[in-house]
Amino acid sequence: LQHRTFCKLPAEPGPCKASIPAFYYNWAAKKCQLFHYGGCKGNANRFSTIEKCRRACVG
């Protein structure tokens, strides 16, 4: 499987302070992990559920 490039991006909470539970793909660990999204900006490596993260980034 050729990974999408956004799956390699680090978790990016962004500058806002909402602390919304979200998931990102941890490229080094090769798995989806929880992080807290601030609610604005950030990057494309952010998913509302672990299942969506796995579908996008896990082989």
Swiss-Prot record:
Taxonomic superkingdom: Eukaryota
One of the Pfam families matching this protein, by short name: Kunitz_BPTI
Protein's cellular compartments: Secreted
Gene3D superfamilies associated with the record: Pancreatic trypsin inhibitor Kunitz domain
Main location: secreted
Annotated positions for site Reactive bond for trypsin: 17-18
Signal peptide (UniProt feature, chain positions): none
Coiled-coil parts of chain: none
A GO molecular-function descriptor: potassium channel regulator activity
Any one GO cellular component localisation term in the record: extracellular region
Keyword tags: Disulfide bond, Ion channel impairing toxin, Potassium channel impairing toxin, Protease inhibitor, Secreted, Serine protease inhibitor, Toxin, Voltage-gated potassium channel impairing toxin
SUPFAM superfamilies: BPTI-like (SSF57362)
Disulphide connectivity of cysteines: 7-57, 16-40, 32-53
Domain BPTI/Kunitz inhibitor: 7-57
Tissue: Expressed by the venom gland.
Other observations noted: Neither DaE1 nor DaE2 affect Kir2.1/KCNJ2 channels.
Family of the protein in this entry: Belongs to the venom Kunitz-type family.
Function: DaE1 and DaE2 are serine protease inhibitors that inhibit voltage-gated potassium channels Kv1.1/KCNA1 channels (IC(50)=300 nM).
UniProt protein name: Kunitz-type serine protease inhibitor dendrotoxin DaE1
